[in-house]
């Protein structure tokens, strides 16, 4: 299988992942969880969102295996599901930071 020859189900999964990350609120939530496990309340406070809205987005992000949850006592803390998520986002931020060249503009 070449790098460009992927099964349809894998393409659909990847499209769904990018669709989820295409929502600015969800992307901010993911970014808030990258450096350390973070609780719903801390995410809500940091992003000035309601806890119920954050919880809704967290359910979607967990279902897509973008974030994982770990219970510690009565609180649940969220973090990146694996290193791929951090790497993907870091790479995309590097990509958008690259200067536009004359060749790109054509």
Short names for language-model regions:
Residues 1-13, 84-106:
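Amphipathic alpha-helical dimerization/coiled-coil segments
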Residues 9-52, 72, 76-84:
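N-terminal helix-turn-helix DNA-binding core of bacterial DNA-binding proteins
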Residues 30, 63-64:
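Extended rod-forming repeat segments used as scaffolds/tethers
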Residues 37-38, 62, 93:
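Residue-level detector of secondary-structure transition/capping positions
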Residues 45, 56, 62-63:
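Alpha-helical residues within the helix-turn-helix
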Residues 55-56, 94:
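Intrinsically disordered, low-complexity cationic segments
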Residues 60-61, 79, 99:
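Alpha-helical and His/Cys-centered functional microenvironments
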